[in-house]
């Protein structure tokens, strides 16, 4: 009993010491937005409440697209399908479970993970619940649906693969993770019979989608500091496959390009990234943990430009909008940047709650969700100008 109370007092002292140390740290103020010369204006199409948001928790509940539908989720379990043009609700399903992972829509199905360690699969056309599976812990990343399989990545280092036909588990992978990690998980990407994902130990690995056999493994982050916090090396951003190459980035690590077939490096550059990457034919666009937006040459990894206008404004990952990239920030702004120069060319303020997750761009629309549970669908300014 005495030992128990001693341990509690010691733990309390450690917590107080850590809090005091945090209080002494310099907090970097978010950079004030500078005036810009806008090349085009951006107009709203419709706005709807999509359920209960919860600041940082809502950030992971990004929507999914399926044909003419936007499928959204809220933290209390409400799944909603909207018509992308009108904003009309097509169907609603309440799972009555707290959701913690983003929505995936593919092969006529919707999949979403819960805080209660389940993944639910619904019919994309009417929202009917078809089946669910139990995993080992809450699901923070979007599930993947590919080649007749559902692939789930959990923050305890595990990967589960299920048959869509039988709903049975086909294979399972377990990886030991560090004691201290970021709250987040790299989503699994399933393509061309391969599953790729990052882990909290700074490694990226590829697996055979059918058998679960590991094809290769590569480090993209390595512990560098002396303290446990400074040695966090999570790979939380989702890898991107482009033209037989894999692009990824880690926290306190590197941005990398590697051969998808064998994991060999094409290039590797210092970076600290937790947001999603954007890759096009010429460049890789990343947002680092300080809020810098950086464009790298896709083939060489050389820096093309860096934009520091959103320092410490918690910018989202970048979305592709023809000759521009789109990012959101913590005050609810969407920003358009020129892909060639990194200069700001347009801006719109949606609301004061902050943008949750990387925007989504289609031919006709730009879609953004806010951290308190709103969805904003804008007219794509490039589509409008092309029609005129």
UniProtKB/Swiss-Prot annotation:
It comes from Kangiella koreensis (strain DSM 16069 / JCM 12317 / KCTC 12182 / SW-125). One of its GO terms (biological process) is Gram-negative-bacterium-type cell outer membrane assembly. HAMAP family: OM_assembly_BamB (MF_00923). Residues 1-21 form the signal peptide. InterPro entries: BamB, PQQ_b-propeller_rpt, PQQ_rpt_dom, Quinoprotein_ADH-like_sf, WD40/YVTN_repeat-like_dom_sf. The lineage of its organism: Bacteria, Pseudomonadati, Pseudomonadota, Gammaproteobacteria, Kangiellales. One of its GO terms (cellular component) is cell outer membrane. Part of the Bam complex. Part of the outer membrane protein assembly complex, which is involved in assembly and insertion of beta-barrel proteins into the outer membrane. It is a lipid-anchor. Keywords: Cell outer membrane, Lipoprotein, Membrane, Palmitate, Signal. This is Outer membrane protein assembly factor BamB.
